[in-house]
A protein has these predicted regions:
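Non-catalytic, topology-defining segments of multipass membrane proteins
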Residues: 1-87, 91-148
């Protein structure tokens, strides 16, 4: 059996004070440790979604389209995709929003996920319904044990 070493995972350190923006979101959230996800979603809404919408309109063509697409691809797929995937994993395990604001979770799943290649509800169905139902053991087809 493998001996576990000292835990090196990052831990939450509460800031001395929250910004007004963070205080606004904390009213809707279950756990203040999920605030980095709000910051990530804000950046995605500013940098990724407007450009993606612009790329799918007939406003740009030819070289102008490509000049916008190349940085869009880098930002969305190289910079944000991994961060978004980690956030999606975490919010599937622990719902970030209070029950009466769960529509915000649905908004992320149904509106934001397609910008990163996820069809609505499929990540949750696979991850929680298939992967974790097998308890992530060796006989699980999507086991992560060999990578630990």
């Amino acid at each position: 059996m493998k001996a576990l070493t000292t835990l090196t995972d990052p831990v939450y350190v509460e800031p001395k004070k929250f910004s007004r923006y963070e205080k606004f979101w904390l009213k809707y959230m279950n756990d203040k440790r999920d605030l980095p996800f709000i910051h990530l979603l804000t950046a995605i809404h500013i940098l990724v979604i407007p450009v993606a919408v612009l790329l799918y309109t007939p406003l740009l063509d030819g070289w102008y389209w490509w000049l916008l697409y190349v940085p869009y691809f880098y930002v969305s797929q190289m910079y944000f995709k991994g961060r978004f995937g980690l956030m999606l994993h975490c919010i599937c395990h622990r719902k970030p929003f209070k029950k009466q604001y769960n529509w915000l979770f649905s908004y992320v799943i149904w509106f934001v996920c397609p910008f990163f290649g996820h069809t609505p509800e499929t990540y949750f169905a696979h991850h929680m319904g298939m992967h974790h139902v097998e308890n992530n053991m060796d006989d699980d087809a999507s086991s992560t044990l060999p990578y630990q």
